[in-house]
Regions:
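Vicinal oxygen chelate
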Residues: 1-20, 22-32, 50-51, 60-67, 72-151, ...
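Solenoidal tandem-repeat scaffolds enriched in leucines and small polar residues
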Residues: 152-157, 161-162, 168-173
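Conserved active-site tyrosine of GNAT-family acetyltransferases
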Residues: 37-42, 125, 159-167, 220
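Minor-groove-contacting beta-hairpin "wing" of winged helix-turn-helix DNA-binding domains
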Residues: 58-62, 179-181
Length: 294
């Protein structure tokens, strides 16, 4: 209007928008046996026990890139779906998985090779899909948790898209018959419909961080969806509902943190799982979770 010419923009600026959800920090699953959990998450998968927090014998935080598994002691909880992991070396992973059999006999532990991934089942039935790094499909990471895929009932995806778009304020997209909900720069919740009967929700949770922490709280609270008030920095909800009619579509606990939470984007230690006392090179103990510049 002032005569200044409008600059042509060669980029789609909306591609850089994350919306209100900026972190998928952890998946929390109770485990009945910390030794077996260590054998699976640390020795078999090659993840890193958090050296600073939860260092006792009744809980373990296992680092995978910028995300974690939280593994408190209790009756086993099973996610109704699959946790996607990126791990840096397929051959080394297979070697670790094979060696871990000796510690995990008599449990549900198993693994199966497939083209492009390895499917792994934890001692209590949780499913992991382990991928090699792939920037085009999984983002520019060499170690991490790019997605959590959840099995849901037929006919629920349109309502779930409305919930995450209208109530939470993040973007969604349909890909290969599944609903992808963006929950961080290169992380997604994936909802995939199934005809298989699903067990009742058993209390496991995922943790997200919201930009509009208070605004989303108000929208959820107006519908009676807040399930727990944890602190000034944190609340929880369980029910995913269709905003159009209030119908409950799915249940999984969402632990929600603000960007002012003391643990938001806390840097995590990741080890190079290829290093052993017999196969060692100084200066190579730490793993880098992100790819170098392209």
């Amino acid at each position: 209007m002032d005569g200044t010419p409008k600059l042509a923009c060669p980029w789609d600026r909306t591609e850089e928008s994350l919306g209100n959800v900026v972190e998928l920090q952890h998946v929390n699953l109770q485990v009945p046996d910390q030794l077996k959990a260590t054998a699976f998450y640390i020795s078999a998968l090659g993840l890193t026990r958090d050296p600073y927090l939860m260092t006792g014998i009744d809980n373990m935080w296992a680092n995978v890139g910028i995300s974690q598994f939280h593994l408190p002691t209790g009756p086993a909880q099973v996610l109704r779906g699959t946790v996607g992991l990126v791990l840096p070396d397929r051959a080394q992973l297979l070697h670790r998985l094979d060696r871990a059999r000796r510690w995990l006999e008599g449990t549900q532990y198993s693994f199966t090779e497939a083209e492009g991934h390895i499917d792994v089942t934890c001692p209590w039935g949780n499913r992991m899909r382990c991928h090699a790094p792939d920037a085009d499909r999984l983002g520019r990471i060499t170690l991490g948790m790019p997605y959590v895929e959840l099995d849901v009932a037929r006919g629920t995806l349109p309502g779930m898209a409305r919930f995450y778009e209208q109530m939470i304020g993040t973007s969604t997209a349909m890909r290969d018959g599944a609903l992808y909900v963006r929950v961080a720069r290169e992380q997604f919740l994936i909802f995939r419909e199934t005809d298989k009967p699903q067990p009742a929700f058993d209390g496991h949770h995922i943790q997200l961080a919201f930009v509009d922490f208070g605004g989303i709280y108000n929208r959820l609270n107006e519908r009676g969806l807040i399930s727990r008030e944890d602190s000034a920095h944190q609340y929880r909800f369980i029910k995913v509902v269709d905003p159009n009619d209030g119908r409950v579509l799915f249940e999984v606990e969402h632990e929600i943190r603000s960007m002012k939470h003391p643990l938001f984007m806390r840097p995590l230690v990741n080890r190079n799982a290829a290093i052993t006392n017999n196969y060692y090179a100084a200066g190579n103990e730490a793993a880098v979770w992100a790819m170098p510049p392209a």
